């Protein structure tokens, strides 16, 4: 039945074309003419990028009222996030998967935000809540080892923040309330005076206990606040220097062993990030970007092995040289991950360092054909030197169609938790492998565009936790196959829509289920319908999960392998600069969990998502 449903969905996508696909006149149907930077670390049209790139715009963030980055990217085809309960602000979760891999690099303005030492996530994107400061989010699906690190096996999430470009000052005030004792207050200010530009954001969020789709109460408490200050100076000639500081702090309470444990665990989080970035146009052909950053992550969960503080310090520099038919990119990345404090079983002061040099050369062989060889050389303080070559071939049939073929290799070192924790193994080997992908970016008409991407990943020395002993081990080889398809259509002046489908198949190991022992779904369908009229706009979003079977050891998860979750957001500008907005989440009160490793609804370690809940608020801009 589910296979027939998936096949029918694909048939609709392939044959019906635009008639099934929608988003509104001013709702963010993202054109393939839009400029993206993540695919090749230099600005280019999305159509020409030789990669599968999805974009979440600032307009989409504002109209749908996403709370954090995790919520914003969850509906991107090919992305799956293991969200525990109400979200990672009151847990230590939000493991990100792209194309079936949890080895994903997260960047803010091109600077790493990954954490090293956490068992449940590689970056705390659910705690990146400064949404007003975001210009757009680029999600690169597929290995991006050459430019972003050999651990970018699944892909890259690059959060691009705003820079005020026009003189003047603009301010946004927002407040909202909802059920489950939800309250939110935010202030955002941006401006430019002469050569100085800035953005300032501050916010506070409160949450209480919630009910799942079966009406059962789940312990949940959150008292969080965040601050963000960016100060920049325009040096002229497309050059600038930017200083940025972010702070996130919270007190929270979660249930001890899953949603229906009545024992509350109280914890704290305290994160901050400081960075300095210099961008310079040295000549008509040569540009330079230099970055230095320091990230701190601190979380304290009673009775958990991963209660610790983590610190990352990094420096990167990149030169881009553009010729008539050639773009040469080269640079280096250095970072150090360390545990300055840990109350668990990993020794305080434990650290690892990695330095890498990379070079990539995009050559236009003809007006239609291009080839991009690349190489990255990493030297890891514990695992030595590894070389990761890559090759991309592009064929631009015309101004509306681009085909590409990519071959990328990767090397993923074990993290500190996998090496040194109670469940770790110091003899683990790095995970290595390659990804082959083929894709098409195509504009059917001025109002309809689509992308298609198919990939195969082969990896060896897979690092996984043993389901019986929980000890980390190298478990052999993995072969991953999948594809994703996305269509965007502007139907009329008022109506628009989008639809995306992704398929994933990972071979089963031993007696386990497919797709990482059932942790990830075989099929995901994402639908968005938008309406825009003068002062009113609304968006209906649906996410369908199919065939996420769960572990062989937890057969009851099969009863919850398929589900749909629908959300609705609406905005009404009742006077100039003033908007009333509302959001209804999980409209049909679906009972589900985003955690594929859950057991059963009445047992420990089941993590129910919230049932139907709402938020209503006011926004003022001046």
Where is each model-derived feature located?
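Extracytoplasmic beta-strand/coil segments of soluble accessory domains associated
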Residues: 70, 74-112
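Gram-negative outer-membrane beta-barrel transporters
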Residues: 364-371, 456-458, 474-553, 573-579, ...
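Periplasmic-side early beta-strands and strand-to-turn transitions of outer-membrane beta-barrels
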Residues: 146, 158, 165-168, 174, ...
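Outer-membrane beta-barrel signature, preferentially recognizing the C-terminal barrel domain
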Residues: 259-281, 308, 400-402, 407-460, ...
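Short acidic/polar hinge/loop motifs at secondary-structure boundaries
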Residues: 95, 112-141
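Face-selective signature of the C-terminal outer-membrane beta-barrel domain
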Residues: 234-249, 266-398, 444, 448-454, ...
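N-terminal periplasmic accessory domains that precede
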Residues: 69-72, 94-97, 107, 124-127, ...
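Surface-exposed extracellular loop regions of Gram-negative outer-membrane beta-barrel proteins
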Residues: 249-251, 256, 338, 345-346, ...
């Amino acid at each position: 039945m589910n296979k027939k449903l998936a096949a029918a969905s694909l048939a609709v996508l392939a044959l019906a074309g635009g008639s099934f696909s929608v988003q509104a006149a001013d709702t963010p149907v993202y054109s393939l003419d839009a400029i993206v930077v993540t695919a090749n670390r230099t600005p280019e049209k999305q159509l020409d990028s030789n990669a599968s790139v999805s974009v979440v715009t600032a307009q989409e963030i504002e109209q749908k009222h996403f709370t954090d980055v995790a919520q914003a990217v969850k509906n991107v085809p090919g992305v799956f996030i293991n969200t525990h309960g109400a979200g990672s602000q009151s847990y230590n979760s939000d493991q990100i998967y792209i194309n079936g891999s949890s080895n994903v690099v997260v960047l803010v303005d091109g600077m790493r935000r990954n954490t090293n030492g956490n068992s449940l996530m590689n970056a705390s994107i659910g705690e990146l809540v400064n949404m007003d400061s975001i210009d757009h989010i680029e999600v690169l699906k597929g290995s991006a080892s050459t430019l972003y690190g050999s651990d970018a096996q699944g892909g890259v999430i690059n959060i691009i923040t705003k820079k005020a470009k026009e003189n003047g000052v603009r301010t946004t005030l927002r407040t909202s309330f909802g059920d489950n004792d939800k309250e939110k207050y935010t202030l955002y200010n941006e401006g430019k005076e002469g050569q100085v530009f800035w953005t300032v954001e501050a916010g506070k969020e409160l949450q209480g206990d919630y009910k799942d789709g079966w009406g059962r109460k789940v312990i949940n408490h959150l008292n969080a606040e965040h601050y963000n200050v960016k100060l920049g100076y325009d040096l002229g000639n497309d050059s600038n220097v930017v200083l940025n500081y972010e702070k996130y702090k919270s007190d929270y309470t979660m249930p001890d062993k899953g949603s229906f444990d009545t024992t509350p665990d109280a914890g704290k989080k305290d994160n901050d990030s400081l960075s300095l970035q210099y961008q310079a146009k040295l000549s008509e052909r040569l540009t330079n970007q230099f970055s230095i950053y320091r990230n701190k992550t601190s979380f304290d969960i009673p009775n958990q092995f991963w209660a610790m503080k983590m610190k990352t310090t990094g420096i990167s520099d990149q030169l881009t040289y553009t010729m008539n038919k050639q773009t040469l990119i080269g640079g280096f990345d250095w970072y150090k991950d360390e545990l300055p404090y840990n109350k668990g079983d990993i020794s305080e002061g434990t650290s690892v360092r990695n330095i890498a040099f990379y070079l990539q050369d995009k050559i236009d062989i003809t007006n239609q054909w291009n080839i991009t060889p690349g190489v990255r050389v990493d030297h890891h303080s514990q695992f030595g030197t590894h070389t990761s070559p890559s090759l991309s071939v592009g064929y631009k049939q015309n101004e509306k169609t681009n085909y590409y073929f990519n071959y990328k290799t990767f090397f993923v070192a074990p993290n500190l938790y996998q090496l040194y924790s109670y469940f770790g193994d110091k003899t683990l080997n790095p995970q290595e492998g390659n990804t082959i992908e083929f894709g098409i970016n195509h504009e059917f008409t001025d109002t309809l565009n689509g992308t298609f991407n198919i990939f195969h990943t082969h990896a060896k020395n897979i690092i996984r936790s043993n389901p019986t002993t929980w000890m980390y081990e190298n478990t052999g080889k993995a072969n991953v196959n999948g594809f994703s398809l996305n269509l965007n259509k502007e139907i009329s002046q008022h109506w628009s829509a989008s639809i995306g489908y992704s398929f994933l198949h990972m071979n089963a190991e031993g007696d386990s289920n497919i797709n990482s022992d059932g942790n990830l779904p075989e099929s995901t369908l994402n639908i968005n319908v938008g309406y825009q009229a003068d002062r009113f706009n609304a968006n209906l979003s649906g996410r369908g999960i199919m065939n996420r079977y769960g572990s062989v050891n937890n057969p009851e998860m099969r009863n919850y392998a398929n589900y749909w979750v629908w959300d609705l957001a609406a905005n009404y500008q009742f006077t100039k600069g003033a908007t009333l907005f509302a959001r209804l989440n999980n409209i049909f009160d679906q009972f589900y969990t985003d955690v594929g490793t859950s057991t059963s609804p009445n047992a420990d370690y089941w993590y129910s998502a919230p049932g139907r809940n709402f938020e209503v608020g006011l926004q003022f801009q001046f």
